[in-house]
Amino acid sequence: SGLLEPYEGQAGYDKLPVFRPCMEQNPAPEKYPFILCAGGRRPQFFHSRTYRVPWLANLEPHTLASLNPADAERLGIQDGGRLKVKTPIGERTYLAETVPGVLPGVIYIVHDDEGDQNVNDLIAADYLDPLSGFPGYRCYFCRVEPAGGAR
């Protein structure tokens, strides 16, 4: 168009976005083989105010960690059982939910604005997108293992 070309490359970034798999940034792939996808929402919890509506909160009183059934079977984790998620900066225990739609090698945890299950605490504060500065909620790295116990 002639409008943007004079400015291309001036900020020191690629002219077009380039996909970089998050596991390339993983400091220890053998120790943290899973991708942690965090910050999603459940339909009943769209805004923080809906967390405080008792009948909505009772629909799902615990934060769930969703993983592929094949991963759960391989790790010995039962649907409704407890699993532990470990990252380089911390660990949390969640109830497991097996979901065929979750890709193998990925664990999906919705955000929880209160309590000791806050998945944001598992992601390093300086793990940011280099271009936008946005936190890397959708693509961090972790280890998943059974924690014992059931719902």
Segments the model singles out, each with a brief description of its role:
Residues R52-S66, A70-R151:
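Long, contiguous, secondary-structure-rich segments that constitute the structural scaffold
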Residues S1-W55:
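Long, low-complexity segments enriched in small/aliphatic residues
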